[in-house]
C-alpha cells in the first residue's frame, strides 16, 4: 500500500471527479489517494463516485477553503 495525493484545487465540477478516476486507474488495490480540492461539490461527488466504483472514503476534512477526501482503492484499478 502506498499513499498518493491529487491536487484539483481551482478545478470545477466535473473535473475533480474525472481527475480522480484517471488517477485511481493508475493505482493498485489498497493504495490511498488524498484528493485536495476547492470545489465544494467534491463533498458529494467523490463519495458518490466511490460508492459506484467500490472504493472506500476514509476521511473528509476541510481546511479553510480546501477540502481533502482520502479514499482507499479497492478491486480493479480500471474503475
What are these regions (language model features)?
Residues 1-7:
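Right-handed parallel beta-helix/beta-solenoid
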Residues 8-61:
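Amphipathic, hydrophobic secondary-structure cores in small proteins
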Residues 68-77:
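Core SAM-dependent methyltransferase catalytic element
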